[in-house]
């Protein structure tokens, strides 16, 4: 059974990973809070992560935290030689570069979304945008009111997929008094209630509209996907991996 450490264990996704770990064992968690344990899982401060990874004989780390904490634990994983699955979003360019550096020493899988449905959605979007190359594009995402980064990491990944097919300029939260330009894509983020995650791309042409969307009903789907990625990552060579590699395996 894969021995997993969870970074951000006191958060909602951390709890979801513990709950979803039926074929893996969560042996330790990392958090900056004063909590000693979560569901009988001991909690250690991220600054002590390297020692804890050795003490608890951890096979792989699953991370759903904030960028600063994720980078601290990534350094610990490099020190201890432990693979890491990074689900944290909102990294700046320096943070992403530091993760890339870590992937030269350990297997590191970075994903903005661990849903198989999102993987399929991105492939459908790539085909649709490439085929309907003169259609207007609008991208919308909705998440719970506690999410701090906007647009979501998944929306940013979808935008990357679109820009691989078309040279479009994102317009965030459209406002003002001017017509739409042909080479732009509207990107909108909504924060309300306890929405797990909704993403939709609208492609609009003359007299027809195509909508491609995905809705997560429960955050457990992300936790299960992250654990699948963690099990898959153990034993891999050092390098940078993505969730699509797991889905295609």
Swiss-Prot record:
The keyword Oxidoreductase applies. It is an enzyme of class 1 (oxidoreductase). It comes from the Archaea. It catalyses: (S)-2,3,4,5-tetrahydrodipicolinate + NAD(+) + H2O = (2S,4S)-4-hydroxy-2,3,4,5-tetrahydrodipicolinate + NADH + H(+); (S)-2,3,4,5-tetrahydrodipicolinate + NADP(+) + H2O = (2S,4S)-4-hydroxy-2,3,4,5-tetrahydrodipicolinate + NADPH + H(+). The keyword Glycoprotein does not apply. PROSITE patterns: DAPB (PS01298). (S)-2,3,4,5-tetrahydrodipicolinate binds at residues 144, 153-154. Its main location: cytoplasm. Keywords: Amino-acid biosynthesis, Cytoplasm, Diaminopimelate biosynthesis, Lysine biosynthesis, NAD, NADP, Oxidoreductase. NAD(+) binds at residues 8-13, 87-89, 111-114. Its EC number is 1.17.1.8. Pathway: Amino-acid biosynthesis; L-lysine biosynthesis via DAP pathway; (S)-tetrahydrodipicolinate from L-aspartate: step 4/4. GO terms for biological process: diaminopimelate biosynthetic process; lysine biosynthetic process via diaminopimelate. One of its GO terms (molecular function) is oxidoreductase activity, acting on CH or CH2 groups, NAD or NADP as acceptor. NCBIfam families: dapB (TIGR00036). HAMAP family: DapB. Catalyzes the conversion of 4-hydroxy-tetrahydrodipicolinate (HTPA) to tetrahydrodipicolinate. This is 4-hydroxy-tetrahydrodipicolinate reductase. It comes from Haloarcula marismortui (strain ATCC 43049 / DSM 3752 / JCM 8966 / VKM B-1809) (Halobacterium marismortui). The lineage of its organism: Archaea, Methanobacteriati, Methanobacteriota, Stenosarchaea group, Halobacteria. The gene is dapB.
